[in-house]
Amino acid sequence: MRRTLCLTVSLTVLALSQAAHAQTASPDAAPDIADARIATSVAPLVVTANRTALAPDKVGQSVTVLTLPQIQADQETVVADILDRTPGVIVTRSGGVGEPTLLNIRGAASDQTMVLVDGVKFDDPSAADGGYDFSDLLVSDVSRIEVLRGPQSTLYGSQAIGGVVNIVTADATRPLQGDAQVEGGSYGTFYAKGGIGGLDGPLSWRLAANDYTTTGISAFDERLGGHEADGYSNQGVSGRLGYEFSPDVSVDLRGLFVSARSDFDGFSTPSGNFGDDSEYGTTREAIAYAGLNFGLLDDRLKNRLALQYTTTDRDNYDPTDAPVTKTFDGVGTNARAEYQGLLAIAPGWQGVFGAEHEQSTIAVSTPAFNDPASPAFFPPGSPPVSAHVSTDSGYGQLQAEVIKGLNLTGGLRYDDTSSYGGHVTGQASAAWSLNGGDTVLRASWGQGFKAPSLYELYSEFGSTNLRPEQATGWDAGIEQHFWDRRIDLQATYFSRDTNNLIVFVDCFDPANPRCAFGGFFANVDRARAQGVELSGAIRPLRGLEITANYTRTDATDRSPGATSGNSLPRIPKDTANAAVSYIWPIKLTTALAVRYAGKSFDDIANTMPLKAYTLVDLRAVYPLTSHLEVYGRIENLADAHYETTFQYGNLGRAAYAGLRVTF
């Protein structure tokens, strides 16, 4: 039924596109696909860094912006695989597509990254650490991604220690427009998506849907005996509706829903053995947003009032029992009301300020482990967790061009949380544009924090005495353009210290009540991450582009004890990416991409090594018409065997081909 829905959307778009092409092209016709790719070097505006659109040379923070042509050129179906190619980002996955997928920025833990979808905070309060799992986030209707590196809690609050990832979906720009894509390939993979929308006077709208299925590979490494393929399916729908009552007043409604199912390997029940496992899980994620935008003071003061709601519902099952046993049941929600104001104080001077109220809830249980009749029962059982926490916040930031080309930014934030009280964070940055923008000097300093998760606070392992994890970081760099901007170079040094890290402490003392369940969460660890990010691009000929980036990350444990000085888990010291693409005179585009990740360790004791690896991809795109193209790619051309999580495999050589249409 779900695949039928998505194919119906896709076929409808295809039919409409053919009807549109039969008419004479109008001035606002859809852009030529190939020509759009040639324009990828144009610097887009940056929104996430200051919560308002600014030219890149006015932004002091380190940020990467990925536009729609760049996203389409990568041909990836999973957002995490696109992000894995950006400076400072490491992605780890416990198996193939759909398995747990975690993202680290500059050596920060995955739960220390803020994830936004169309500006809406998207985490999972039901997860043990409260972080976001990227496994179910497909490219689907994504049209833009911004990756903001460094502590950013002043504007974004808890979790923004490593940085912020803002994912933006497509919006309508013409009276009627749409797109569709169908793809198939290795491991029984099928992917289809479609979207349609319009902008007609004051009304704008868009609807989109996707369907993805794959038989997958064994999540447990096949070289260690994994043989059972762990499949995955994902169906999603999204939509947005906007209406302008006047030039100063508008409303904005958005929604997203994802339903996914994944097989997984790990510790089986009831034996507890690690390896091939027949368990599977289902996930349902949803986002709802309603906003009112209005201007005051001759539109010098732009205001936004919004209500946001997100929910994640996860269930795991063991089919080996009769009847099927539910081993995990977790629901996490976030409800937020917020106000944001943007005041144009004077030419080159503006302030952004706001207030937020957020309430997060958790309801988690492990039914199979608590049922004495279940073969998975493990006395004394695991008590269910049901709790909530509320946070009230206020922030303000001033951005000013104090002299021509020199932009300074500074801000403060205060959070009052029901679980631990108040917390203050601040940040400052500078961007100095010289030589007509060909040289940009940047520097930023910021603080970040991560509040204890609801599970860390209220589970049988938790403590309401936990304090927030805290971080202070800075970076400085230069951006240089040469040869009429056909050569772009960037270099950045970064450093961050994090304290009060929350970890699980093993404890087996029967006289200590905190040891009743074998351990507890506590603020005991410290860490430091520092390094260098280098990136560059050269376009020596029309249609030819060469890009590369390299990141050196020294992320180490700074806690007293045996592991002091050890590398943090799953953070390679060296990562690099390079790509060469060329648009031939016949408009065929070919590309070769290489990714390298150095060796790392899966544990803080540094006893479980993860070997270095190199991946090579080939891609090709050919436009049949200005609105219809075929494409294909070979991933992991050399069929390299590698692990990003200890004893979990990854996809070998794989080939995919597809068709994309726009109108």
Where in the sequence are the language-model features?
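N-terminal Sec signal peptide and the immediately downstream disordered periplasmic leader
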Residues: 1-76, 80-86, 243, 288, ...
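Membrane-embedded beta-barrel scaffold of Gram-negative outer-membrane proteins
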Residues: 203, 210, 300-318, 359-363, ...
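Short acidic/polar hinge/loop motifs at secondary-structure boundaries
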Residues: 121-149
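N-terminal periplasmic accessory domains that precede
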Residues: 79-82, 100-104, 113-116, 132-137, ...
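Periplasmic-side early beta-strands and strand-to-turn transitions of outer-membrane beta-barrels
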Residues: 153-154, 166, 173-175, 183, ...
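Conserved C-terminal beta-signal and adjacent last beta-strands/turns
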Residues: 2, 6-8, 197-200, 208, ...
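Gram-negative outer-membrane beta-barrel transporters
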Residues: 401-408, 495-497, 522-603, 638
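Extracytoplasmic beta-strand/coil segments of soluble accessory domains associated
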Residues: 48, 80, 84-121, 143
